[in-house]
Amino acid sequence: MDQIVVELFLLSIGASFVQRTTGFGFGIFIMTMLPSIMPSFGEATTLSGILAMTTSLIIVIQKYKYITWRRLLPILFTFIIISIGAIFVLRRMEYHILNILLGITLIIVSIYFAFFSKRIKVKTTLPVQVTAGTLSGLMGGFFGMQGPPAVLYFVSSEPDKDRYLAMTQTYFLAGNLIMTLARAYNGFFTTTVSIGYVYGIAGVIIGNLIGSWVFKHLSGSLLKYIIYAYIGISGLIFLLEA
């Protein structure tokens, strides 16, 4: 039990640091190990979601003035609808094939954006927002990792890193809240999840403080390439695990 507490604490520090520094990645980081220490995959995604939600809440309180709702609401509403549907079919999914496809997709996307990001101009049109929200909803509902599609949209559509961080964290805060309610309805919010949250919250706060310092020293262009690299590494991890 003591070992699990230490592992959860350290995982929460790392995941919160990544989220605060890059604007996403809490679920990607923590879900590489969390399923192995939780009773079920559904409980792991639930714990990941509420810890990530806490991280996002802290950031939203700090960056609320940078939110532009007209660029946020369409992608957010699409995400909510799709992710709820994905959660309801979670128990019937075969993860082996999905992990392979997810890993390949993340690697291709990260390479494409890293080399062609200067040529890519993401317009804040409704079709683009719906597409990003749909992909994000599927990844969030199935894997608890809704970040990459939304982040690629926001990092291209927002004019500076403060607005990028405000938009992504408001998106993740609202999305994780809805997904937590859906997971609770499906029986994934258990006593074990509640206890895990108590152990992980201190790590979330520590990781957030460290990440906040690092974020202040990052330029906008460097932040983009860190995001692309992290998405690619995440894809490689999925392939190796599959």
Range-by-range predicted roles:
Residues F113-S136:
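Alpha-helical multi-pass membrane helix bundles of inner-membrane/thylakoid proteins
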Residues I4-L73, G133, G137, G147-I201:
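Small-residue-rich hydrophobic segments that form or flank transmembrane alpha-helices
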Residues A44, G85, V89-L90, Y95, ...:
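Hydrophobic alpha-helical transmembrane segments in multi-pass integral membrane proteins
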Residues Q3-V6, E43-L47, I97-I104, P127, ...:
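Alpha-helical transmembrane segments of integral membrane proteins
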Residues V60-P74, L90-I100, I120-T124, F189-I195, ...:
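Interfacial helix-loop-helix linkers and transmembrane-helix boundary segments
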Residues T21, I61-K65, R92-M93, F115-F116, ...:
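Helix-loop junctions at the membrane-solvent interface of multi-pass transporters
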Residues E43-F115:
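Membrane helix-loop-helix hairpins that form the core translocation module of multi-pass transporters
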Residues F79-I87, Y95-F115, Y199-S212, G220-A242:
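Selective transmembrane alpha-helices of multi-pass membrane proteins
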